[in-house]
Curated annotation (Swiss-Prot):
It comes from Pectobacterium atrosepticum (strain SCRI 1043 / ATCC BAA-672) (Erwinia carotovora subsp. atroseptica). (2R)-2-phosphoglycerate binds at Q167, K342, R371, S372, K393. NCBIfam families: eno (TIGR01060). This is Enolase. One of its GO terms (molecular function) is magnesium ion binding. The gene is eno. It catalyses: (2R)-2-phosphoglycerate = phosphoenolpyruvate + H2O. Belongs to the enolase family. InterPro entries: Enolase, Enolase-like_C_sf, Enolase-like_N, Enolase_C, Enolase_CS, Enolase_N. PANTHER family: ENOLASE. Component of the RNA degradosome, a multiprotein complex involved in RNA processing and mRNA degradation. Keywords: Cytoplasm, Glycolysis, Lyase, Magnesium, Metal-binding, Secreted.
Length: 431
């Protein structure tokens, strides 16, 4: 009943109005899985390749008809007749057929869409929710937890058209007892922040991930206005709400220096920028910092881990790109203590699960993440619960492409009840 009988690829539109790949996988029992590939803006240089057409006369070169053709042609032919429940085999067939290190033949966007659609179809054929099927694929059947959200309420960097260098300023509702309560707390702070920004004459337009994107005098000012909003919403900073940042430092790394254009082109060495971040953690309850240095600055990361790693969660995104080879090197060298997990950085569900397992086995945490270009596909919610990853980044409290994931988490928590605990701050490395 789980044999693949049809695969359909199509070009759809993501949350930025750019094309992306959607795949349908049909099984002989009439079961269907539907999944879409997300797309990043600030991308690591070692990510699996997102195949774009490059035809400037169509979607400004961002079309994905080549990737869709790969789904409808060679990929479909290769997986027809195969058992969708054997996820590792489905993924291996596609990866081997592509034959490149970075999936550049078919595109990670093509392979990932089929990989996730096959998993959804297989879950349906087993009569299981997707999170339960993922837990079985993960070798941890029935072991679930609800993730602590990192809510990106001020957007900067590549995610917004403003003067803020650091890409994401996030809140974590650690005082919540349930995921649903965490979402309520996040929503209240988000709306209160709008009032705070308006009272200061600042804009409340939102960025790619649904957070506000005001022009600010400094990166520290973003933390200050969030702190004000937390208090005005009736919460205590550090007890009810903690803070997290994604520096995406590769985006402002120039000629061996970290240059903050929004602060008058202030320039820092790796060590200086580490201490700049350390000073912020002394002023505010920041418990997690992502990509605090450039992805290639491993010597700097070793220093940053030495200085901050025993008290702050240091998350590698561009640094590790959900790649087990790179992650293993980082673990061996004591670089960072957490990995950001993005399906499309590596391009298949099987490889994603391997990265989560490797991180956990090494004592690193794993933070499941969206991309800045998203769709209504909420698979990452099921991934977070099904692997008991413990943390999720899926944007702010606006934009349907972000809220779709929160709503799926609410549904899952309702279905699982006490069998999926919400552990709050305990999930964060160093806390």
């Amino acid at each position: 009943m789980s044999k693949i009988v049809k695969v359909i690829g199509r070009e759809i539109i993501d949350s930025r109005g750019n094309p992306t790949v959607e795949a349908e996988v049909h099984l002989e029992g009439g079961f269907v899985g539907l999944a879409a590939a997300p797309s990043g803006a600030s991308t690591g240089s070692r990510e699996a390749l997102e195949l774009r057409d490059g035809d400037k006369s169509r979607f400004l070169g961002k079309g994905v008809t080549k990737a869709v053709a790969a789904v409808n042609g060679p990929i479909a032919q290769a997986v027809l007749g195969k058992d969708a429940k054997d996820q590792a085999n489905i993924d291996k067939i596609m990866i081997d057929l592509d034959g490149t290190e970075n999936k550049s033949q078919f595109g990670a966007n093509a392979i990932l869409a089929v990989s996730l659609a096959a998993a959804k179809a297989a879950a349906a054929s087993k009569g299981l929710p997707l999170y339960a099927h993922i837990a079985e694929l993960n070798g941890t059947p029935g072991k679930y937890s609800m993730p602590l959200p990192m809510m990106n309420i001020i957007n900067g960097g590549e995610h917004a058209d403003n003067n803020v260098d650091i890409q994401e300023f996030m809140i974590q509702p650690v005082g919540a007892k349930t995921l649903k309560e965490a979402i309520r707390m996040g929503s209240e702070v988000f709306h209160t922040l709008a009032k705070v920004l308006k009272s200061k004459g600042m804009g409340t337009a939102v960025g790619d991930e649904g957070g506000y994107a005001p022009n600010l005098g400094s990166n520290a000012e973003a933390l200050a206005v969030i702190a004000e909003a937390v208090k005005a919403a009736g919460y205590e900073l550090g007890k009810d709400i903690t803070l997290a940042m994604d520096c995406a430092a590769s985006e402002f790394y120039k000629d061996g220096k970290y240059v903050l254009a929004g602060e008058g082109n202030k320039s820092f060495t790796s060590e200086e920028f580490t201490h700049f971040l350390e000073d912020l953690t002394k002023q505010y309850p920041i418990v997690s910092i992502e990509d605090g240095l450039d992805e290639s600055d491993w010597a700097g990361f070793a220093y940053q881990t030495k200085v901050l790693g025993d008290k702050i969660q240091l998350v590698g995104d561009d640094l590790f790109v959900t790649n087990t080879k790179i992650l293993k090197e980082g673990i061996d060298k004591g670089i960072a203590n957490s990995i950001l997990i993005k399906f499309n950085q590596i391009g298949s569900l099987t490889e994603t699960l391997a990265a989560i397992k490797m991180a956990k086995d090494a004592g690193y945490t794993a933070v499941i993440s969206h991309r800045s270009g998203e769709t209504e596909d909420a698979t990452i919610a099921d991934l977070a619960v099904g692997t008991a990853a413990g943390q999720i980044k899926t944007g702010s409290m606006s934009r349907s492409d972000r809220v779709a994931k929160y709503n799926q988490l609410i549904r899952i928590e309702e279905a699982l009840g006490d069998s999926a605990p919400f552990n709050g701050l305990k999930e964060v490395k160093g806390q």
